[in-house]
Amino acid sequence: MAILGLGTDIVEIDRIEAVISRSGDRLAKRVLSANEWAQYQAHQQPVRFLAKRFAVKEAAAKAFGTGIRNGLAFNQFEVFNDELGKPKLRLWDEAERLAARMGVTSVHVTLADERHYACATVIIES
C-alpha cells in the first residue's frame, strides 16, 4: 500500500452560517448527496453538519489532487458513519471513476469540530 494523496481542510462554522442566512439551503443542496441532504434536514445542528461535510469534501478534493472541477462535484463525495461511528467516504460518479483510474483501494477520513471550526483530513491509498 502507498499513500496517493493527503488533503486537509478547516472551515469556519460562522461563515457557513452566514451563507445559509444569506442564501438559504443553496449551498447545502450543492454540496450534499441525497442521503446527506436528508440527514441535514433532520439534524439538530444543521450548520455544524454542513460545515463538517464541507470540510471533508474539500479535503478529499485536495487528496485526489483535482479540486472541484472537470466533472467532479462536492455531492459525489458522501460522508457516512460505520457501525462504530467512524466517518467514511463513499464515492459516486466521476469521483468513483477517478479513484479507479488512480488505483485507490482505501480512503481514510478523520473529522473534528470545536466551537468555531470544523476540520477534516482525508488520506487515499493504493
Swiss-Prot record:
Family in the record: Belongs to the P-Pant transferase superfamily. AcpS family.
Reactions the enzyme catalyzes: apo-[ACP] + CoA = holo-[ACP] + adenosine 3',5'-bisphosphate + H(+)
Protein name: Holo-[acyl-carrier-protein] synthase
The enzyme's E.C. designation: 2.7.8.7
Pfam family, one: ACPS
CC terms in the record's Gene Ontology section: cytoplasm
Listed InterPro entries: 4-PPantetheinyl_Trfase_dom, 4-PPantetheinyl_Trfase_dom_sf, ACPS, Ppantetheine-prot_Trfase_dom
Keywords: Cytoplasm, Fatty acid biosynthesis, Fatty acid metabolism, Lipid biosynthesis, Lipid metabolism, Magnesium, Metal-binding, Transferase
HAMAP family assigned: AcpS (MF_00101)
Role according to the record: Transfers the 4'-phosphopantetheine moiety from coenzyme A to a Ser of acyl-carrier-protein.
GO molecular function: holo-[acyl-carrier-protein] synthase activity; magnesium ion binding
NCBIfam families given in the database record: acpS (TIGR00516), pantethn_trn (TIGR00556)
Principal location listed in the UniProt entry: cytoplasm
GO BP term (any one): fatty acid biosynthetic process
Signal peptide positions on this chain: none
Gene encoding the protein: acpS
Gene3D superfamilies from the UniProt entry: 4'-phosphopantetheinyl transferase domain
Binding-site residues for Mg(2+), renumbered to this chain: 9, 58
Record's subcellular location: Cytoplasm
Named cofactor requirement(s): Mg(2+)
